[in-house]
Every structure is written in C-alpha cells, then in structure tokens.
Amino acid sequence: MYSEENSSGKPLANPDWLLNHHRAKIPERTAFAKKLAKLHPKKIVDLGCATGLWLELLNEIMPLDCEFIGIDSDIQSLEIAISRSRSWSRKTSFLQLDIEKDVISIPSADIILAFNIFPYIKDLDAFLNTLNAKIPSGILAVRQYDGASIRFGPMATAMRQKIEQDLYIAIGNSEKFRHYDLDRTFIALKRSAYKKFEYSFELFERTSPFDQEFVPYYEGTLLWTCQHISDTSAELLNKWMNEDVHLQNRYFYEVDLVALLS
C-alpha cells in the first residue's frame, strides 16, 4: 500500500510525500517566500514544520539575522529538519510540541507560519483565539489546500464524480484529519480575533508534458486516491492512468487559500 502517513500516523505527512509535494510547487512557494521576506521579519515560527522544507526554502531568501523556530509533534520529522538545518548560518531551533494542546507554549515571532496544518486541529476557533491572545503583535501566514478542488484529467464527468464521491465517503469524516477543510478554515479566520485579513486563492496548475519535478507528486496523488476509493472506481482510475502512461495528454490543478492576518 502507498503510505503517506508520518511516524505518528498523520495523513499526508510522510517525509517522502512532503518532499514530492514541495518540489512540485517550488515556483509558487518561492514566490510566496519572497513576499514574506518583504515584511522584514526578525523571527519566524513554523507551526507543523515537519521535515523543515519551508524553512529550508526561506533560509535561501531571508537575511541571516532572521531567527527560525520549527515546531512539530512528530519526532522523526523533527530529526530530519534538524539534520537539514545543520548547514544554515542563522540562529535556528526546533521544538517538539502538540500545537493544539500546547498553544500557550508557542514562542512569539514576527511571522507565524501555519501551512496546511489546520486539518489536524479539532477546535480551530479556540486555537486561533488563544494564539492571537498569546502573540497579539505578530503576523499569521496561512496556506491551506482545498481537497475539494484537486482535479486531474481529462476524464469523463461521470467517472470523475464517482471517484470524488467515493473519496469523500472514505475520508470525509476521518478522525485523523480534514481533507475538505478550506471553508472551515476561511470561516474560522474571518471570525477570529485578528483585525486585518488579507486573503487570496492561489491556483496551482500543470499541463503535460509535465516537468519531472512535478511527476512524483502527481503520481502519488493518484495512488493515494486509488487506495481510498472503491475497488470498482480504483480499477477505472488505474485503467485511465494506463491509457497515457507517458503523460502526454494530462492536466492537474488545485487551489490554496493564502492569507495574512494581524
């Protein structure tokens, strides 16, 4: 079975999955990192930093006087992040915390990164309000993918609808994470204690022929989908994949909510 869980059992958090995802989106993520650099932070805290990929990217862009703190609950991921950071010439540290249970222990910073972590937080309203009360002067930078917008094709509409329905039935009520969390996130951000809310929707799109940096993420997404849908739908999806094994007539897109709050 294709595994995308980390050592703590969190879905879509396996180190290999995260690396493939990151490499696929380097252009978009680099552009956002440069936007954050224009805010001239002196300290950045990355909530759910996992293996440190975002901090590694920011390390190439931020001035060396900007301190980094990475926080995650998974010790294996933190060990990879620590190893990744050893060559950095800046003050860097990592903390093992459950960010929802230990929100009051989150250090203050000029920018708090919350990238695709909200699906793992049960009471998002309480988390945001506690975070704002604890760190009232910093900027909260949010990036949240929308599981409902992930689309690959071209594909017959009936087949697509069946696959999407199967996937929702399988994971829509998962107790491990919320794959369809963009609307809950948007509502929670809007009614939080943050006063300023700058938001946009970022389109990630690729059309064939695909760049080789994108292919592992694309194929991983299809394999992950196959293992959650019904056997009948998985057979159809596998047949569809085999009809174009060289990826000459394919597209992929998804949408992320991107927000800066203060």
How should these model regions be labeled?
Residues 4-16, 198-251:
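C-terminal helical/coil "lid" or tail adjacent to the Rossmann-like core of SAM-dependent
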Residues 23-40, 57:
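Conserved alpha-helix/loop element of class I SAM-dependent methyltransferases that forms part
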Residues 41-50:
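Conserved class I S-adenosyl-L-methionine
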Residues 53-101:
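Class I SAM-dependent methyltransferase SAM/SAH-binding core
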Residues 110-124:
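A short SAM/SAH-binding and catalytic strip from SAM-dependent methyltransferases
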Residues 125-139:
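A short glycine-rich, Lys/Arg-flanked "PGG" loop and its adjoining helix->strand segment in the class I
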Residues 141-209:
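Conserved catalytic/acceptor-binding region of the Class I
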